[in-house]
């Protein structure tokens, strides 16, 4: 087995984020079992090597039967997604069939509305045209034109030059009119990527839950669990310190939010997806990223996993596994050939630590759904999602917990709701 101790880190990550990587971004291509360590400062006389680990790569660690089961079980989890942000790569003006708001248009609108705080020129709109005239890149917000609302004869360039000399109030009025023709939703390039396992709360979906794929394909997902547990066992074998930290955190969760007996709550499944340069987010920082690849057996080329700041790349083939620091900038080289490459990324979602019991999280789900469907609710309105500010410290939620036998959780919010013990739980 090979061990590489890197001497330098090239600070180019921020410049590369969101761009595609290629063969020019690495000098070392790893195609054999290998451990790679980041530069270790000379001042660290007794380093804990796990603190400096960039990656551990092992080839051929899965049987062909296990790979085939994982492929058949997980490939459908990688549906078309627009939620991968910069990892989906750069957007051009007419890419993916969308009429993107270009970077030039975005900057001109910001300038005309007065939100471009760095403008110092007497002719800022003209300056934007000089700076971004030849850019075909979509704007950083990922917005698209609502072509059904935008007048067919609207020409952005003519409009921009016609309003630039209006008074500030008149310009703002014009800009607001144009903003009405632009989507409020941000989009990324569509890619084949999805999640399986379990997911934490966030504002619009305020309950921990089983992902859609694992709910709707429970048998298939269950068939993939031995493959995922095998990755976890390799994690334990190769990086025991990081595994122990992550496994301890996962063990604190309700078993219903753990994938088998693994150190993971969640997996991301990508299908023939060339990721642009990015850093992973949302995983347990003290843990480590674990990735494996399976395929349909048809050859493909490329898809090297590149760490541009370390000038290193790894050729992860079906049946291999890599443990990697996903918080370092990384991405893939182009993928060629007819083969279907399925990458499986296993991790613990950091905010899963906030999840309580399955019964409690299910109660949160049912509470939200009951509100959403109850058109007699005082807050109800068309397209309401059942969520409102402060809802988890209301008498409505407190009584719902009591009625559903979740007295322990009701007691935890009793004082916040009533200002004192209500006496309800004493009855």
Residue locations for each model-derived region?
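Fe(II)/2-oxoglutarate oxygenase catalytic core
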Residues: 1-290, 314, 336-342, 348-427
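Contiguous, well-ordered alpha-helical segments that form the cores/surfaces of helical PPI scaffolds
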Residues: 286-295, 320-323
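Short His-Asn-centered micro-motif
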Residues: 294-295, 307-309, 324-326, 346-347
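A short beta-strand-loop-beta hairpin characteristic of the jelly-roll/cupin
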Residues: 295-317, 358
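Conserved metal-binding segment of the jelly-roll/cupin
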Residues: 314-329
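Short, Lys/Arg- and Gly-enriched loop/turn segments at beta-strand edges
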Residues: 330-336
């Amino acid at each position: 087995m090979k061990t590489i101790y890197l001497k330098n880190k090239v600070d180019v990550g921020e410049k590369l984020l969101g761009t595609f990587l290629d063969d020019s971004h690495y000098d070392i291509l790893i195609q054999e079992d290998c451990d790679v360590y980041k530069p270790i400062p000379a001042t660290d006389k007794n380093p804990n090597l796990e603190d400096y680990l960039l990656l551990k790569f092992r080839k051929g660690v899965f049987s062909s039967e296990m790979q085939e089961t994982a492929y058949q079980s997980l490939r459908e989890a990688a549906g078309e997604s627009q939620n991968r942000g910069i990892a989906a790569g750069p957007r051009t003006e007419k890419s993916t069939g969308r009429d993107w708001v270009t970077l030039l248009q975005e900057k001109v609108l910001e300038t005309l509305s007065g939100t471009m705080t760095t403008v110092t020129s007497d002719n800022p709109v003209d300056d934007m045209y000089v700076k971004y005239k030849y850019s075909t890149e979509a704007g950083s917000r990922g917005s698209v034109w609502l072509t059904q609302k935008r007048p067919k004869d609207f020409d952005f360039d003519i409009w921009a030059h016609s309003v630039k000399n209006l008074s500030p109030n008149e310009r703002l009025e014009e800009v607001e009119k144009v903003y009405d023709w632009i989507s409020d939703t941000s989009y990324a390039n569509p890619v084949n990527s999805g999640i399986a396992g379990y997911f934490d709360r966030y504002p619009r979906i305020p309950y921990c839950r089983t992902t859609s794929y694992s709910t709707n394909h429970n048998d298939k997902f269950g068939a993939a669990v031995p493959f995922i547990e095998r990755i976890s066992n390799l994690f334990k074998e190769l990086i025991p310190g990081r595994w122990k930290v992550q496994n301890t955190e996962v063990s604190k969760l309700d078993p219903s939010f753990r994938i088998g007996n693994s150190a993971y709550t969640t997996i991301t499944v990508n299908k023939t997806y060339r990721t642009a340069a990015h850093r992973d987010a949302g995983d347990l920082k003290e843990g480590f990223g674990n990735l494996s690849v399976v395929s349909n057996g048809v050859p493909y080329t490329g898809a090297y996993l590149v760490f541009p700041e370390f000038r290193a790349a790894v050729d992860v083939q079906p049946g291999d596994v890599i443990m990697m620091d996903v918080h370092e900038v990384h991405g893939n080289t182009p993928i060629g050939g007819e083969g279907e490459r399925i990458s499986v990324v296993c991790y613990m979602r950091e905010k899963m630590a906030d999840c309580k019991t399955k019964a409690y999280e299910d109660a949160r789900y049912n509470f939200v759904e009951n509100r959403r469907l109850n058109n007699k609710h005082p807050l109800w309105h068309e397209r309401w999602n059942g969520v409102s500010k402060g809802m988890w410290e209301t008498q409505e939620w407190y009584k719902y917990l009591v009625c559903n036998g979740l007295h322990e959780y009701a007691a935890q919010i009793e004082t916040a709701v009533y200002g004192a013990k209500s006496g309800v739980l004493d009855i």
